Structures are given as C-alpha cells and as structure tokens.
C-alpha cells in the first residue's frame, strides 16, 4: 500500500512540475483540437437553429389561432389562403409549411369531440375528421357541453445545416383557442349564409 502511495505522489509531483513548462508545438495542438472545436461549434449551431425553428412554428400557430379567435365574419377560402400566406411571412425560412384550421365542439353525452368544419393548405394535409380529432384528445382542453373552439395545426420540415447526429424531422404544433367575440365561427365558400358550415 505504501508503494502505491509513493508512485501516486511521484506522478502528481511530475504533473505539477510539468504544468509550468511551456515547450510544445502550437501547430500540433491546433491540429488536435480544431476538429473538436469545429464539431462543438457546428453542433451548437444546429441545436440552436432547431430550437429557433420550433419556436417560430409555435408562434405562427398561436398568431393564426389568435386571428381566428377574433374573427366574427365568415371564414372563406380566400381568408384561409391569406392565413396560409401569413404563416409563410411568419416563417420565412420554413421548408414546405403546412396548416390546418378546424372548428370543433365537445359533445358531453357521447364524451367525444366533433369537427364542425376543417380546411387545410399545404402538401399532404387534409381536412380533420372526428376520428383524427379524438385521437389527439389528450392535447385538447376539457370543455363544457357544446363549447366551440378553434384548432390550428402547423407543420414545418427541418433539415439540420450540419450532420451532427440529428436527422431531418417535422415540427408539429397544435393550438386550441376559444372564440372571443362570437359564439361560433362559420366557414362559407361564397361568404354567405347559404352554404355556411357552423
């Protein structure tokens, strides 16, 4: 045991004596450390950029939800196209943004959510169905019978700038907003009551 202690003390003494030595090659040290520093910088950049993209997608969904909650007129295809364009403005660097706007209600006797109307813009996104809505019921708020709310869903694809072990993926956000100024929000192709879905 005493011998092991002496070896450890001798090693520590050599280490402390060597810490004041300044002999070395800066080029060799740079060659050894530069790849690690570049990898750390690239990884930090990618993860920061991913959080930024997620934040922008979430803010866009909340903004669209807020716009819809204040609307008291008919929602028309032109209005939805404008909201899709707004999403594009809010997410300028986004790749293939997609959006789905739905109005739904809660039916207490059947303990289920029902879609009143739904419309979507973007590739690969279709209108929401009752079955699909009830699949995400864990993300929906508790509501009284026949309460109406809007559901805005946004998707955007994200591909990392550098390969740091993070595969390309899609950000998806769901935002539920209660209507503020009207009891219901109707969708109409013509903008009139004749074909309104409420």
Predicted regions and their residues:
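Alpha-helical assembly-interface signal, strongest on the long, hydrophobic N-terminal helix that forms
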Residues: 1-89
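Short, conserved structural patches
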Residues: 2, 62, 66-198
């Amino acid at each position: 045991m005493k011998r092991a202690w002496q070896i450890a003390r001798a090693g520590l003494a050599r280490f402390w004596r060597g810490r004041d030595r300044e002999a070395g090659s800066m080029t060799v040290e740079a060659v050894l450390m530069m790849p690690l520093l570049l990898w750390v910088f690239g990884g930090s950049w990618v993860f920061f950029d991913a959080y930024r993209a997620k934040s922008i997608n979430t803010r866009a969904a909340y903004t669209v939800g807020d716009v819809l909650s204040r609307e008291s007129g008919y929602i028309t295809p032109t209005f939805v196209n404008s909201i899709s364009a707004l999403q594009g403005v809010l997410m300028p660097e986004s790749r293939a943004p997609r959006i789905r706007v739905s109005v739904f209600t809660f039916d207490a006797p059947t303990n289920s959510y029902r879609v009143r109307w739904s419309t979507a813009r973007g590739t690969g996104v279709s209108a929401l169905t009752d079955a699909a809505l009830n699949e995400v019921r864990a993300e929906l708020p508790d509501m009284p019978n026949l309460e109406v709310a809007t559901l805005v869903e946004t998707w955007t694809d994200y591909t990392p700038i550098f390969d740091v072990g993070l595969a390309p993926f899609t950000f998806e956000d769901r935002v539920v907003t209660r209507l503020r100024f009207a009891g219901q929000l109707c969708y109409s192709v013509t903008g009139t009551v004749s074909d309104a879905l409420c």
